[in-house]
Amino acid sequence: MRMSAAMFSSFRCKTRSSKVMLRRGRKRRRRIEDALVAPEIPLDLLIEILTKLPAKSLMRFKCVSKLWSSLIRSRFFSNCYLTVKTPRRPPRLYMSLVDHLLCNSLMVCHYPCESVLLSSSSSAESLEQNLTIAGMGGRNMVVLRGLILYVVCRTASIYNPTTRQSVTLPAVKSNILAQKSHWNSLLYFFGYDPVLDQYKVVCTVALFSKRLKRITSEHWVFVLEPGGSWKRIEFDQPHLPTRLGLCVNGVIYYLASTWKRRDIVVSFDVRSEEFSMIQGPLKVSAFSESVGFIEYGGKPAVFDYTMMKQTGLVDLWVLEDAGKWSRKSLVLQPCQMHLVDNDIEFNVEGTTQNGEVILAPETIISPYYILFMTSKRMI
């Protein structure tokens, strides 16, 4: 019995010692694990880090956690990402190659067509196929804050080059389109309200007679949000849009003509959803093929290059306050005149962030080159 009691006592001591050692080991491992766990990154610092990363990295980092996914997908982060300037993001040039010329917003497309959206960085050797979309038109494409609005067969879609996702808007149920007439048009305009942080698409449908002796127009607005739908906006001044529009400081502007070809600029306040009209430059025709509508110095401007091939002279009409126009002249140097050959027709494709006007040949030529024109030089 004494031996058994001694053995039992020794066993109890060993058991207690083992439990103490086990507890000490758990505490030691807990301290090591706590030391290895990284401290939580402050939200401001996390946003600052993420906004400096390439878009492809952001798409991968959405899988890190639900917090990161919701943050990267939020409108707040998108706005921060757009305002950050970093050399890691070289400017990209997008072009759309369409295999059916007649598939655009002014004609009903009866044949399927496909296009390839290509993008290139500053290196001419770098060309990347971004997206293949059935019938993605190249003429009626509007870029706004990193989003691209494109139109195919009178249907508008929004493409995000960062996520490579495309959303098609529902068709506009217009009374004008229901009428069987060859003299009608449909144009979409893309706007952004910085106060309410909203994107809106405006659709203007017009029915007109020869020489514009009679014009009827309807106007529709679509808010880009879940469950969005087209809403008709009343405006008692019938007009025919003649150019794609642009959005400046929460206002959409576009060139148009009214009864008897009176050239005007139509403005649409994205937030209040109200239209107004401004008399266009008297010496410029809104129907001229050598006229572009661009943003210049944060203001709408008419780019008239009718005499560019003959004299090297370009007139720039800038819309100032109170609806007045100021005229500026751009002159090509003699050594640059060979770039605007008489056999090549150019189209104005917009402006860069540095204020350079983009001129591209209307048809595919070899070599195919794009002109960047400023008030000081042409590249």
Curated annotation (Swiss-Prot):
SUPFAM superfamilies for this protein: F-box domain
Q: Which PANTHER family match?
A: BNAA05G37150D PROTEIN-RELATED, F-BOX ONLY PROTEIN 8
Q: What is this protein called?
A: Putative F-box protein At5g62660
* Domain of life according to the entry: Eukaryota
Q: What SMART domains has UniProt attached to this entry?
A: FBOX
Q: Which organism is it from?
A: Arabidopsis thaliana
Write down a Pfam family by its short name: F-box
The organism's lineage is: Eukaryota, Viridiplantae, Streptophyta, Embryophyta, Tracheophyta
Domain F-box: start-end pairs: 35-84
